[in-house]
Amino acid sequence: MPGSDFRNLMAQSESSGNYGILTDAGGGDMVAGAYQFGDARLEDFMKDTGEEFTREDFLASPELQDRVMNWHEQDVVDYAMENGLDRFFGQEIKGVPVDMSAVVGMAHLGGRKGMRDFLESGGELDKKDKFGTFISDYGRKFSGQSLYNETPPRPRMRPQGLLPPETSPRPMARPAGLLG
């Protein structure tokens, strides 16, 4: 499986690395592929990139699934940086050493809002999925994993230009004590 330590761990955790799996996430929602993306997240990807595909296309293409995962990681990192959530990096919240990979892991389970609520509440808002997995569980599991194995993230373009350097995504997850 190509990519980062984070991505390999995510695929193993979500699907045992099975790119062709379709799982009932409860409430009539299905999640698909090695990383178990739901329809809403796949629609976010298609809207952002202009690509279009069916769930069947997605399940049949490991390359497409890896592209979506690349986009997903970058999208969560951009969201965290644009919303000042990097101020939590280096802290431990409810047993989660907060770094970029923990943030992406928490957002993968609970969405960007669930991750943000967890951080801003000091861990008090720690939602769980239908299997009983808490956002904090994913934070602990994925903290310290390298996100970008092949290329560092690109700065996201905005109408006013590039984000200033102090808000640009950091290229690698870093040990909690090293973030300033």
Mark where each language-model region is.
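Non-catalytic cell-wall polysaccharide-engagement segments
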Residues: 1-28, 34, 40-180
